[in-house]
Curated annotation (Swiss-Prot):
Belongs to the class-II aminoacyl-tRNA synthetase family. HisZ subfamily. It comes from the Bacteria. This is ATP phosphoribosyltransferase regulatory subunit. Keywords: Amino-acid biosynthesis, Cytoplasm, Histidine biosynthesis. This function is generally fulfilled by the C-terminal part of HisG, which is missing in some bacteria such as this one.
Length: 392
């Protein structure tokens, strides 16, 4: 089968207006992070598989291939682990505030509707144990969404320590933990009720309530505190309360105590961003204080935020925010000996471009086809208008 006209699963072309909008969004996001004091970092698209082979990345669906020396390499499925590699191996001084943007690749299943190639931008705050690092990530995410004029978005908070504490007390096998994780993610009331009956613990009331513990932050957190006396869970709930109180003035903040991230490296506060016009989250992040241990014997506290720029481009388009590209209003046909004058005239004339046709008649035909209202001819004799008309 000849595939030279097809694209791999989960990839797509972007043309003209969409491509320009995606480019501008990436610029805006990077500029916003720069204004907040973040330093840009870039890592290769290709990494050795070992960077992503830890238990933290067990669920990642990788594009794998061998290099010329037979070593297994992958296309990066996220940016966090490569940045962890850089920080751990280059000897840069902590603490750090880093920003990035670039492509990531995940080999999702066919017909799942997910994009295997995504443009991602984000920040990593490394070396700050304070809760102010989480607050900075959330404020930065909210600031970006406001700068991009994303309408009706909301930030949802969770805490990885809640799920970890439940798993620790239940002492589940790996298979049982996977099943339980799925029940939590699906908010399956019936499934969790059956699970609790088969795995009784001191957290029964809390676990049974997890599928319903999402919504307005203050009410849900108060309800959750009334369902458990476990110190670990209560500490996590208090951290969530602190963050809600700190950032709620900036955006609509909700909580979901059943929020479980796809990557296992999160240890503390986790968060996502949603909007009315989006089917899935386009912002995610959280704290992962042990991630760097994969690359070095010491650990460093870290918090990260990632934005799916492709989803944000789609959101802007649905909201009618993306502006039409400025049309060409003047086509400049020129004789070769008059190229310097034509180039100077183009530089001084907004929304103009040079014609590449040999004859003036072809330039005029092109202008009519593409609704360009005016054509001039630049020669050694000067500049002459050869087409001028109104365009609907």
């Amino acid at each position: 089968m000849n595939l030279n006209k097809n694209l791999p699963t989960g990839t797509r072309d972007k043309l003209f207006r969409e491509a320009q909008a995606a480019y501008k969004i990436e610029q805006q996001v990077n500029h916003y992070f720069e204004k907040r004091g973040f330093k840009r970092i870039e890592t290769p698209v290709i990494e050795f598989e070992d960077v992503f082979s830890s238990e933290h990345q067990a669920d990642a669906k990788l594009y794998r291939f061998f290099d010329e020396k037979g070593r297994l390499t992958v296309l990066r499925p996220d940016m966090t682990l490569p940045i962890g590699r850089v920080v751990s191996t280059t000897g840069v001084m902590l603490p750090l505030k880093l920003s990035y943007s670039g492509k990531i690749f995940r080999a999702n299943e066919d017909f799942g509707g997910e994009q295997n190639e995504q443009t991602q931008a984000g920040i990593e705050i490394i070396g700050y144990p304070s809760i102010k690092a989480e607050i900075e990530c959330i404020l930065s995410g909210i600031g970006v969404l406001n700068a991009l004029e994303i309408p009706n978005f909301q930030i949802e908070l969770g805490h990885a320590a809640i799920y970890r504490r439940v798993i620790q007390l239940l002492n589940l096998s790996e298979t049982a933990e996977i099943d339980f994780r799925q029940l939590i993610q699906n908010k399956s009331l019936t499934g969790i009720k059956r699970f609790v009956a088969n795995n009784p613990s001191t957290l029964d009331d809390f676990i049974l309530a997890i599928p319903r513990l999402f919504g307005p932050a203050t009410a849900i957190l108060n309800q959750a505190k009334s369902l458990t006396t476990d110190k670990g869970i209560l500490t996590a709930l208090r951290e969530m309360e602190t963050i809600v109180e700190a950032v709620s003035y900036t955006a609509d903040i909700s909580v979901d105590l059943g929020l479980v991230q796809d990557f296992h490296y999160y240890t503390g506060i986790i968060f996502r961003g949603y909007a009315d016009l989006a089917a899935d989250n386009f912002l995610s992040g959280g704290r992962y204080d042990h991630l760097l241990e994969q690359f070095t014997s010491s650990s460093s506290p870290a918090v990260g935020l990632a934005l799916n720029l492709d989803s944000l481009t789609t959101l802007q388009n649905r909201a009618g925010i993306i502006k039409k590209q400025t049309p060409t209003t003047l086509l400049i046909h020129y004789d070769l000996e008059a190229l310097p004058q034509a180039e100077k005239f183009m530089q001084e004339t907004p929304n103009s471009e040079l014609s590449f046709f040999e004859t003036a008649s072809n330039a005029i035909s092109f202008a009519k086809k593409w609704h360009i209202p005016e054509v001039v001819h630049v020669s050694s004799q000067g500049i002459q208008t050869i087409l001028q008309r109104e365009v609907d």
